[in-house]
Amino acid sequence: MTDSDHRLPDRPGEGDPGRGRRIGIDVGCVRVGVATSDPDGVLATPVETVRREKSSDRHVRRLAQLVTELEAVEVVVGLPRTLADRTGPAAHDAIDVAEALARRIAPVPVRMADERLTTVSAQRSLREAGVRAKGQRAMIDQVAAVGILQSWLDQRRAALAAPGEGGHG
């Protein structure tokens, strides 16, 4: 059993690096969705979808490049825990990508955020917006990354506004 068997999501606001862009990442089997925030951490927007390479770390290199290009102060990777709050294969995969990315971008912190049902929510949003199923595949990972990051930003703002909570703000 590894540490990742019991990996729980991080809490927004703890060890907060202060003002600056954040990057949200949705790790999938085939693609990785990427989103970013404005420097004030108010709004998440899609950036790109990175093709996943199981046989190489090309996707991790691209993610690290985006962190540098966007001058991110924090990275938030979705942790897809099961509905029973367990760590399944998808969560182990996300943790592996997060750890590989953290090694490349240190000292920029990489956090894990609870992302149960974000892909389902993203699919529903795209369907309601009239995007056909074929078109959804190209966008779904970015929309899920936006959902992960926006949730983190909202929770961070609330944590930093609470008395005695958070970091620099």
UniProtKB/Swiss-Prot annotation:
Biased composition (Basic and acidic residues): 1-19
GO process annotations (BP): rRNA 5'-end processing
UniProt GO molecular function: nuclease activity
InterPro entries: RNaseH-like_sf, YqgF, YqgF/RNaseH-like_dom, YqgF/RNaseH-like_dom_sf
Location of the protein in the cell: Cytoplasm
Chain spans, region Disordered: 1-22
A GO cellular-component term linked to this record: cytosol
Enzyme Commission numbers on file: 3.1.-.-
Keyword field: Cytoplasm, Hydrolase, Nuclease, Ribosome biogenesis
Pfam families: RuvX (PF03652)
Function field: Could be a nuclease involved in processing of the 5'-end of pre-16S rRNA.
Family recorded in the similarity comment: Belongs to the YqgF nuclease family.
Protein's name in the database: Putative pre-16S rRNA nuclease
